[in-house]
Curated annotation (Swiss-Prot):
NCBIfam families reported in the protein's UniProt record: PRK00179.1
Chief place of localization: cytoplasm
Protein name: Glucose-6-phosphate isomerase
Active site: 353 (proton donor), 384, 513
Organism: Bartonella bacilliformis (strain ATCC 35685 / KC583 / Herrer 020/F12,63)
Location relative to the cell: Cytoplasm
Molecular function GO terms recorded: carbohydrate derivative binding; glucose-6-phosphate isomerase activity; monosaccharide binding
Amino acid sequence: MLPDKKAFKESLKALKKHVTQDKVCDIRQHFSEDEQRFARLSIRLDDLLFDFSKCGVTLDTLQLLDNLAIAADVLGKREAMFSGKIINTTEKRSVLHIALRLAADKVFILNDRDIVQDIQSVLARMVKFSKMIRDGSYKGYSGERITDIVNIGIGGSDLGPAMVTSALKPYHDGPHCHFVSSVDSAHITDILADLNPATTLFIIASKTFTTTETIENARVARQWIHSHLGENAVGVHFVAVSSAIDKAIEFGIDSSRIFEFWDWVGGRYSIWSAIGLVVMLAIGDQNFRQFLEGARQMDQHFKDTPLHQNIPIRFALLGFWHRVICGYSSRAIVPYEQRLVRFPAYLQQLDMESNGKHVSLEGRPITFSTGPVVWGDSGSNGQHAFFQFLHQGTDIVPVEFILFVKGHEPNLNHMHDILVANCLAQSEALMKGRSHEDVYHTLMNDGGESDEADNLAFHKSLQGNRPSIMLIQDLLTPFTLGRLMALYEHRIFVEGILMNINSFDQWGVELGKEFANELLPVIRGENEADNRDGSTLGLLKHIQNRYVE
């Protein structure tokens, strides 16, 4: 079935009318009227609980959203992705990061080739190499064991691997892993300052092997090895993860240490491919397979579960409701798990690079707001930073809480109890708020003066009725992390379907790159600053004058 544009417009119109009705978004009233609201508005998948009962929706809202999903042909486009059809239309590519998670005994034919065999072949090479590094049988040029890995990449070659490696710290039993992404020389300088060239291995992670930031950092690392160990050491201390095998070889990396991935794997979805080599080195191949298995479970759930019980689809519909219908311009990601402190930054790329688009699949301007601003921090830090804004700011920001029932430190369970209590409390406080009247009576009971109490009560009252979603799993493990990440991948894909955009390209990042290439020789004094705007000319002049001084 193709999208039904007429039915979609009617569904959108019905939703916009529905949101204006009295009490539709009154979460507190919904709970007072329905004792079964939590049961009706939550979904479970094994130990994963997806609770959206604190969103301003009713059963009627959900039905209208389901109608919208049907009109947009969410199920048909889901099938198109899983069958390998070209859904990245502007780049004419299939979108098959899901294939990277398939079991080894599956078959997936793309262009007359079983890509599962290709995937498993690269995975087997990753396993063999990681075991050699981890057991010490792979030696550096001087015969010493490799103790430190430096992953050089940016965007999807950095955000995912760095986040996952940090999140799975309790499972680390391999070499120390470091990440360099910025072209700011301070980044690689500070990392290398604490490392020994003889025991350091570099992973150059770049799909095209042309990304400026990555290649500049790789050259610095190459020179560092060359100056300390000699040119012959370069091939021993570097591996590459890339689609551009020839460019990696030209850089000086032996073909046996180049791990391939394919053009049907988008950068921000590449953690499941050889880009995840650094993760495997840190946690071992069995834990890495569990990571893939967790994502596979969510893939299966997304593929096979009916619409009304499908967590990624329901998650996406709520995101559409908040962004397009309610007009909330951002969403806050708040993991109450310190090891997921980098998860919001990872989701920023996954979400905003995917759905930060202004034209439809047909190349026409979109008439409603698309992807929201995605931001956040770990829960404990957030409470002492931006939660004031969430509770009393003039903008309503839906919050997505991520919580785990248990921690990895059983001797410190009392601290985890405090963490859980704070997460649940913030979710409840955002919804319930505190009225001026309640605050006033409390102040008066504490012996306050009437006029002063009345004024102070305005400052201390909270409107409440602020929506939030809660995602709870038992424990942060490779499996549960993989499942969580796949959930967000599919949610963002479905939101893109509802917005009628291509979630798998990123043309918006190209113009800045072009301008940077034009400006670099100007900054170096090699070219004149022709055809620049007045502001840029002024900035260039200031920088050049200050540099001379």
